[in-house]
Amino acid sequence: MQLTVLASAILALAQGALAIPAKAPALDVTLSQIDNTRVKAVVKNTGAEEVTFVHLNFFRDAAPVKKVSLFRNATEVPFNGIKLRFRNKGLTDDVLTTLAAGATFEDEFDIASTADLTEGGVVTVRSQGVVPLTKDNKVSGYIPFTSNEIELEVDGAKAAAVPAAINLLDRRTKVASCSGSRATALQTALRNTVSLANAAASAAESGSSSRFSEYFKTTSSATRSTVAARLRAVAREAGSTSSGKTTYYCGDPYGYCDPNVLAYTLPSKNIVANCDIYYSDLPALARSCHAQDQATTTLHEFTHAPGVYSPGTDDLGYGYQAATALSTSDALNNADTYALFANAVNLNC
């Protein structure tokens, strides 16, 4: 990993936990093709009550996040956008969506802006997962969503004409290395990440089976070995500040740090970037179970990077309640599950 910093100017953020509602609502997503690679999503609250949820990493997010999964011949097409981690308390109103029972909203986006579809041909599009519910601007639960599946006959030439959402030449001012208080904070976070990831790897291999099952829903030796391998890879990456597979920015190179985003990863380039509130809102290490901190945020982001351990993780369940409700296969592919497990091992939760 190579450390880099750039000038950034964004505002403030924080953290939290989850609790499933008594009568769990759900969101239904209807996908349709507008033209070639341009897609419309209609999101409907199918529950009996009004819900408010975070739409970061979801439909309505203006950033190039993963809203749908794309498949060609049953193989997933690599995603070229960003995966971000946001605070789970103190959320600003502009990243929250409120839907009355039966209400809908629409979102239109071009899937070719975050995936290479220049080959053309048939592409299958679908989406499912959970999004965080909120109360008083704090994550308080989660709501599942699922979509229909559509097949698109993609014109490769037209797809090639769609501008990429992220242009690597558009980076802001880049300074040679981290400096000052941010350099100190990040170096501390990286050292803590090494310790947390190694301890969590050992716990995955031979620690409490009940704790492992709490997060990964199995005690199989194969799964424990897989989790340990990813965590040890994270520890190696965090310990290599002048080499390694990732480039780590102390600031925001692409302008995706809004006032609620702690950090983000560009998996296609193995780039990790911290946002202002990573430094202002997070402690170096959490003192309570399931809380966010700098070290587990860095750990979370490293699991997204396929250069650290392939394949990189997604964001399938955010926060303790959502993450521990996932199946084994989804937990293995969920960044927050690794961060939460490391926190639990560190604090003996």
Curated annotation (Swiss-Prot):
It is an enzyme of class 3 (hydrolase). Its EC number is 3.4.24.39. The active site is at E301. GO terms for biological process: proteolysis. Residues 1-19 form the signal peptide. Binds 1 zinc ion per subunit. It holds the Pfam family Peptidase_M35. GO terms for molecular function: metal ion binding; metalloendopeptidase activity. InterPro entries: Fungal_M35_metalloproteases (IPR050414), Lys_MEP (IPR029463), MetalloPept_cat_dom_sf (IPR024079), Peptidase_M35 (IPR001384). Residues 20-172 form a propeptide. Disulfide bonds join C178-C250, C257-C275. Zn(2+) binds at H300, H304, D315. It is found in: Secreted. It catalyses: Preferential cleavage of bonds with hydrophobic residues in P1'. Also 3-Asn-|-Gln-4 and 8-Gly-|-Ser-9 bonds in insulin B chain. GO terms for cellular component: extracellular region. Keywords: Cleavage on pair of basic residues, Disulfide bond, Hydrolase, Metal-binding, Metalloprotease, Protease, Secreted, Signal, Zinc, Zymogen. Its cofactor is Zn(2+). PANTHER family: NEUTRAL PROTEASE 2-RELATED (PTHR37016:SF3), PTHR37016. Secreted metalloproteinase that allows assimilation of proteinaceous substrates. Shows high activities on basic nuclear substrates such as histone and protamine. Belongs to the peptidase M35 family. This is Neutral protease 2 homolog ACLA_052720. It comes from Aspergillus clavatus (strain ATCC 1007 / CBS 513.65 / DSM 816 / NCTC 3887 / NRRL 1 / QM 1276 / 107).
